[in-house]
Design a protein with these regions (language model features):
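Short, Lys/Arg-rich, polar N-terminal cytosolic tail immediately upstream
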Residues: 1-12
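Alpha-helical transmembrane segments
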Residues: 14-30, 92-97, 170-174
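Alpha-helical transmembrane segments in multi-pass membrane proteins
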Residues: 19-70, 119-126, 134
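Juxtamembrane/transmembrane-helix boundary motifs at the membrane-water interface
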Residues: 28-52, 109-112, 183-191, 232-238
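Membrane interface segments of multi-pass transport proteins and intramembrane proteases
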Residues: 38-46, 112-116, 159-169
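Juxtamembrane helix-loop-helix connectors linking adjacent transmembrane helices
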Residues: 42-47, 72-143, 185
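Structural signal for the C-terminal ends of transmembrane alpha-helices
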Residues: 64-74, 209-213
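Transmembrane helix-loop-helix hairpins at the membrane interface
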Residues: 102-105, 130-238
Length: 238
């Protein structure tokens, strides 16, 4: 199998489709930031869930077609490692993510007088109240898969031509910024920066994990496990 910078190569016959995945993701996030989705959600939250499901399924289908061999080869490498090894990697990743999030929360409580969740997280919480099963599927399975493919499987490998550290920082910045688009203009600057820092550090962590293991399924597993923990916390508070 041909290698590119030690990463499993993607079939470049589908360059346009891969580019389309990134464009659809960016457009969806920008539309969400514009308030259109919030308006539909206020009329009926099911519209928000439906649009999110269609968006995620569209990306998954496009990714499956464009990056089939990449996903299969990566999964074979992932499965070749002992289960105990992969579990340790996932637990280590989740543990570091928890530590980073805890540090950011301390900074947030120190610097901000009014603390609230980000608009992105608020939208997710709303889905859990009315459609918990669909919310779990979107946040624990679909979201981690599509986000890791976009930010690590595609964008990280694109920026890695300028160096792996550049790839880690660039994708971390984009990951943090995209998750905060919904909050632009809706919160004070200090709170915004603290919430952005939380997502940014998560993106940096996931970037270093991909740099270390060079396997997208490890990233998906860690991202999905973290979201599962968050989902359980949300569901227990409803």
């Amino acid at each position: 199998m041909k290698k590119e910078n030690n990463y499993i190569s993607t079939d470049m016959n589908h360059k346009k489709l891969i580019f389309g995945v990134v464009i659809i993701h960016v457009c969806f996030m920008l539309i969400g930031a514009s308030g259109i989705l919030s308006g539909l959600k206020e009329k009926n939250i099911f519209y928000g869930v439906l649009i999110n499901m269609i968006y995620q399924l569209t990306l998954i289908i496009m990714i499956g077609v464009a990056m089939k061999q990449y996903l299969i080869t990566s999964f074979k490498k992932f499965k070749a490692d002992r289960i105990s090894v992969n579990i340790k990697r996932v637990l280590a990743g989740v543990g570091i993510a928890f530590l980073l999030s805890y540090i950011v929360r301390i900074i947030e409580m120190t610097m901000c007088s009014n603390i609230s969740v980000s608009a992105n997280q608020s939208n997710v919480n709303g889905y859990f109240v009315d459609y918990p099963i669909l919310a779990v599927i979107m946040s624990v399975i679909m979201g981690p898969f599509t986000e890791e493919i976009i930010y690590r499987g595609i964008l990280f490998r694109f920026f890695s031509k300028y160096g792996e550290l550049c790839a880690v920082l660039s994708t971390g910045f984009l990951f943090g910024t995209m998750h905060m688009l919904f909050s632009f203009g809706n919160t004070n600057i200090l709170l915004f920066l603290c919430q952005w820092l939380d997502y940014f550090l998560s993106g940096i962590l996931l970037g270093f994990i991909y740099k270390k293991y060079k396997n997208i399924w490890i990233n998906v597993s860690i991202h999905g496990t973290w979201n599962l923990i968050v989902a359980v916390i949300i569901l227990t508070q409803i």
